[in-house]
Amino acid sequence: MIREEIKALIISSLAIALAFSIAMTGGIFGLINTKITNFLLLFAYSLFVISLAFILHELGHRATARKFGCYAEYKMWETGLIIAILLSFFGFVFAAPGAVVIYPRYDLWGRPIPLSKKKSGIISISGAIMNIFLSILFLGLSIIYPLELFNLASKINAWLAIFNLIPFPPLDGFKVFAWDKRIWLIAMISAIFLYFFV
């Protein structure tokens, strides 16, 4: 099971990195005019920054859910990956590579024990918290080593946190907002601050 999950994460990461690389060149027309060496460099960059942000986001959900006694596993959505790559040829990416599927614990009679609103909210916010942490980490690195790579990595992670905290289903922000509006607001303001004002 772990081997399948790792395989799904690797495939998802490669597909997302490819989609972002194509979109960042300007889509199909930009891709035609881009040197193969430049594209490979961009792909390597995307693989590092975007895949790291995506994998740690998903593992944040997974680890928190398992801490609450649930079974959690990342499931790849093949259709979402194909859509992401196809849309990248038009210059933009809508990435829906998959999600961590959570199965609740069962009681002695085999009945599922539903997650409380608080636990569900904590599991949901853990992915965004991971991205906020990475954004701060890369921001610190960009101050010490002023490389565009670190600066952009900080912004990408902040953007992922903002996007996932939007309080509409099926995004994580919906469950966080339902659990605790103050915590949702603090997380959202932190992510927006990192993206726009740093």
Task: Name these PLM-found stretches.
Residues 1-198:
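Hydrophobic transmembrane alpha-helices and their immediate loop junctions
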